[in-house]
From Swiss-Prot:
This is Augurin. Pfam families: Augurin. Expressed in the brain, with expression in the choroid plexus and the ventricular ependymal cells (at protein level). GO terms for cellular component: apical plasma membrane; dense core granule; extracellular space. Induction: Decreased expression in the choroid plexus after penetrating injury in the central nervous system. Residues 1-31 form the signal peptide. It comes from the Eukaryota. It comes from Rattus norvegicus (Rat). Probable hormone that may attenuate cell proliferation and induce senescence of oligodendrocyte and neural precursor cells in the central nervous system. ECRG4-induced senescence is characterized by G1 arrest, RB1 dephosphorylation and accelerated CCND1 and CCND3 proteasomal degradation. Disulfide bonds: none annotated. InterPro entries: Augurin (IPR028173). GO terms for biological process: anaphase-promoting complex-dependent catabolic process; cellular senescence; central nervous system development; G1 to G0 transition; regulation of cell population proliferation. Belongs to the augurin family.
Length: 148
């Protein structure tokens, strides 16, 4: 009876010894893994890197860098010249083309354009349920009079 109760204790002790041997003993060629892990944890605190320029000067320099706005209708680009020629070939005159280009380029700059975000609403005016605000738009007419 005494031998059977000692057997688990011996097995536990042998397992613990094996575990300690694996952890503390030399691993592969690189050496003791546990010691290396502990040394990494206790490693020297990295010192602050010396920089040639002050933070203020660097931010001032980087703040001045702005990406150039991409100009879609830049006439020096060959594809724009090709578009222009195609528009003229399709029958658009130069003044109409310039007018259209100016309209689309300046569309969002002048507040409430008629076809901007305020006046034109895309919903069915003959639908059973109208717009959410009754005062906003007329509802139920078969013609959207706001567009005429």
């Amino acid at each position: 009876m005494g031998t059977s109760s000692a057997r688990p204790a011996v097995l536990a002790l042998a397992g613990l010894a094996l575990l300690l041997l694996l952890c503390l003993g030399p691993g592969d060629v690189s050496g003791n893994k546990l010691k290396k892990m502990l040394q990494k944890r206790e490693g020297p605190v990295p010192s602050k890197t010396n920089v040639a320029v002050s933070e203020h000067t660097a931010k001032e320099f980087l703040g001045g860098l702005k990406r150039a706005k991409r100009q879609l209708w830049d006439r020096t680009r060959p594809e724009v010249q090709q578009w222009y020629q195609q528009f003229l070939y399709m029958g658009f005159d130069e003044a109409k083309f310039e007018d259209d280009v100016n309209y689309w380029l300046n569309r969002n700059q002048n507040g409430h354009d008629y076809y901007g975000d305020y006046y034109q609403r895309h919903y069915d005016e003959d639908a059973a349920i109208g717009p959410r605000s009754r005062e906003g738009f007329r509802h139920g007419a078969s013609v959207n009079y706001d567009d005429y």
